């Protein structure tokens, strides 16, 4: 959360399974649409919160399976655990609040007396969450009796039934809604309350999110009967809650548009960027657009044309070079030439590219340092490069950006593990310094600005080397 300098423009709080993630969409099309929209327009000044019933381990399994963005805050285990940032730092204060009138041992003891309660897997059992499966016809009676018994034992608990099968026993002060209320209270105390908050869900355990005052809410089109019944009984007259006509992440995008919370046309919905004018152009938008073009080129979703390649080269400065994660350094025009030969090499097969954690900082009058995690998915395989880009805005067209240099390193554990040419040597050729200094000098930029770029790259673990051995990009097969 510290990455934002002021009040968040928008905070999206979304459930994962069957809300952000559509398990009936093997190509993850709606999720990738949301990803592109968020990274292009919202990441710099907004907050993304995932609120899930999954435990931390189960959440990580989903991240390994699906192209999920990195959220600013993760609320897990039905609102009993809150973690911040990429490193998922736990909120100890929240844990201490939940300890009041809670004894997990007593809960386990009392629930063991109900043979119809089938314990969920060990991965889903947490310090403040005891979870079971139970048939819907038996659930209501069990909830009434169990609540009474636990109250007699001196506990103050909440029992949530969702998805027509899952029963969770939590501390009274827990739950997705209470976790969100706690976060909003913290933001208000710090003077950083988001200008708008949009909550999104599909099942019974998301009802609490929609109950929070002064938030907008979206029930995705595939919302379960239990949530729709709750809405009909409690929130039908609340104009700040809609039942979307689109499934999952597409329904979230629909909610953004319905409540006029900001841009709601994903870059993935734009067929021809040259013919489409957008109101917000930023370094982050340029990165999203570039890698979307790269995906479409490899999949032959756009026709092969020298015109496309000429336009692509116009994005790069004549001095621009790319350092591949293998350590290979190439002039960017060579990379474009190699890319031209790869047109349609993934046609008819699943090949997807998306970016995560896009950030940009202005380090000169017209110079930006852009960082992102660039992911590629080839069927069951996923690779990720941490990418650092130096960009300059065109003086005559300040909303257009020129790429001066690109440096990539493998994200630990997410590189290619097969040929030796893929080894993540993380080198910077000293000649690269000369190229960037020449480019910055030609553009009347301070050498300190170029130095800032290299300090940033070196901080990611790159190593200076006098000479890099050339490796054919045909061996590497990924020019960008």
List where the protein language model places each region.
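Residue-level recognition of beta-strand termini and adjacent short loop/turns
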Residues: 163, 234-236, 364
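Short helix-terminating capping/connector loops at secondary-structure junctions
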Residues: 5-7, 42-45, 68-69, 123-124, ...
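Active-site phosphate-binding/coordination module
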Residues: 29-124, 222
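Short, aromatic/basic amphipathic alpha-helical patches
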Residues: 62-65, 144-147, 227-235
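A beta-strand edge to alpha-helix "cap/lid" segment located at domain peripheries
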Residues: 276-299, 306, 321-440, 453, ...
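Mg2+-dependent phosphoryl-transfer enzymes with acidic/Ser/Thr/Gly-rich catalytic loops
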Residues: 2-11, 170, 177-279
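Asp-based phosphoryl-transfer active-site loop
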Residues: 8-25
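Conserved acidic, metal-coordinating active-site core of Asp-based
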Residues: 107-213
């Amino acid at each position: 959360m510290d990455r934002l300098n002021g009040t968040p423009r928008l905070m999206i709080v979304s459930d994962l399974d069957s809300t952000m993630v559509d398990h009936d969409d093997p190509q993850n099309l709606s999720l990738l649409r949301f990803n592109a929209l968020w990274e292009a327009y919202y990441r710099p000044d907004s907050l993304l919160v995932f609120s899930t019933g999954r435990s931390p381990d189960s959440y990580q399994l989903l991240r390994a399976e699906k192209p999920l963005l990195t959220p600013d805050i993760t609320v897990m285990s039905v609102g009993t655990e809150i973690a911040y940032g990429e490193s998922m730092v736990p909120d100890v204060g929240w844990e201490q609040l939940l300890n009041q009138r809670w004894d997990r041992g007593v809960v386990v003891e009392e629930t063991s007396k109900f043979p119809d309660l089938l314990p969920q897997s060990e991965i889903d059992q947490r310090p403040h969450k005891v979870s079971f499966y139970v048939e819907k016809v038996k659930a209501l009676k069990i909830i009434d009796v169990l609540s009474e018994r636990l109250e007699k034992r001196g506990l103050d608990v909440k029992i949530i039934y969702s998805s027509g099968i899952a029963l969770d026993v939590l501390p009274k002060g827990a739950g997705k809604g209470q976790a969100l209320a706690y976060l909003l209270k913290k933001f208000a105390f710090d003077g950083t309350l988001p200008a708008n908050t949009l909550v999104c869900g599909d099942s019974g355990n998301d009802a609490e999110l929609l109950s929070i005052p002064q938030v907008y809410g979206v029930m995705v089109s595939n919302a379960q009967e239990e949530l729709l019944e709750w809405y009909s009984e409690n929130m039908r007259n609340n104009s700040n809650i809609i039942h979307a006509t689109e499934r999952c992440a597409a329904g979230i995008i629909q909610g953004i548009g319905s409540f006029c919370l900001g841009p709601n046309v994903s870059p993935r919905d734009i067929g021809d960027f040259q013919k489409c004018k957008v109101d917000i152009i930023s370094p982050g938008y340029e990165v999203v657009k570039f890698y979307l073009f790269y995906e479409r080129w490899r999949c032959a979703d756009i026709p092969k044309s020298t015109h496309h390649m000429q336009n692509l080269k116009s994005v790069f400065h004549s001095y621009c070079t790319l350092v591949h994660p293998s350590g290979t350094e190439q002039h960017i025009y060579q990379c474009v030439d190699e890319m031209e030969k790869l047109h349609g090499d993934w046609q008819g097969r699943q090949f997807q590219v998306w970016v995560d954690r896009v950030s940009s900082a202005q380090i000169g009058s017209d110079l930006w340092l852009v960082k992102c995690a660039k992911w590629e998915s080839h069927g069951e395989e996923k690779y990720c490069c941490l990418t650092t880009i130096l960009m300059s805005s065109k003086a005559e067209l300040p909303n257009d950006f020129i790429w001066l240099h690109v440096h990539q390193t493998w994200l630990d554990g997410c590189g290619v593990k097969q040929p030796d040419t893929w080894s993540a040597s993380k080198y910077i050729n000293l000649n690269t310094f000369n190229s960037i200094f020449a480019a910055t000098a030609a553009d009347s930029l301070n050498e300190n600005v170029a130095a800032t770029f290299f300090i940033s790259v070196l901080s990611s673990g790159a190593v200076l080397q006098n000479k890099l051995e050339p490796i054919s990009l045909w061996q590497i097969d990924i020019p960008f």
